[in-house]
Amino acid sequence: MIQQESRLKVADNSGAREILTIKVLGGSGRKFANIGDVIVATVKQATPGGAVKKGDVVKAVIVRTKTGARRSDGSYIKFDDNAAVIIRDDKTPRGTRIFGPVARELREGGYMRIVSLAPEVL
């Protein structure tokens, strides 16, 4: 579960390395986000020459969480880190590559471009 002030690794090549959650989108007073949810975040660490700079406010979709997510068949999926992909307003990623595995729940959320770029979908 990701909440305000949570720091996440960025799993794409948009130029950001780490982001800090400002707000969880989707309803007033919403506290937590899970895989497939959109957050507003600020860039805390960035690589030189990237598309996004340190201090930029961006939207991101969560692709991996340590807490994991429960699936309809009763199983759980958990990852070793908390990671997100920076997106545009039309749900397409800002970067051109995705690093590491992503969860299958992104397919139901309409993030087909992220799913197709990912090296592994679990």
Curated annotation (Swiss-Prot):
GO biological process, one term: translation
GO MF term list: large ribosomal subunit rRNA binding; structural constituent of ribosome
SMART domains according to UniProt: Ribosomal_L14
Protein known as: Large ribosomal subunit protein uL14
InterPro entries in the record: Ribosomal_uL14, Ribosomal_uL14_bac-type, Ribosomal_uL14_CS, Ribosomal_uL14_sf
This protein's UniProt keywords: Ribonucleoprotein, Ribosomal protein, RNA-binding, rRNA-binding
Domain of life: Bacteria
Family: Belongs to the universal ribosomal protein uL14 family.
Subunit description: Part of the 50S ribosomal subunit. Forms a cluster with proteins L3 and L19. In the 70S ribosome, L14 and L19 interact and together make contacts with the 16S rRNA in bridges B5 and B8.
PANTHER family referenced in this protein's UniProt entry, alphabetically: 50S/60S RIBOSOMAL PROTEIN L14/L23, LARGE RIBOSOMAL SUBUNIT PROTEIN UL14M
Coiled-coil annotated spans: none
Organism: Streptococcus thermophilus (strain ATCC BAA-250 / LMG 18311)
GO cellular component annotations of the record: cytosolic large ribosomal subunit
One Pfam family, short name: Ribosomal_L14
Function of the protein: Binds to 23S rRNA. Forms part of two intersubunit bridges in the 70S ribosome.
SUPFAM superfamilies: Ribosomal protein L14 (SSF50193)
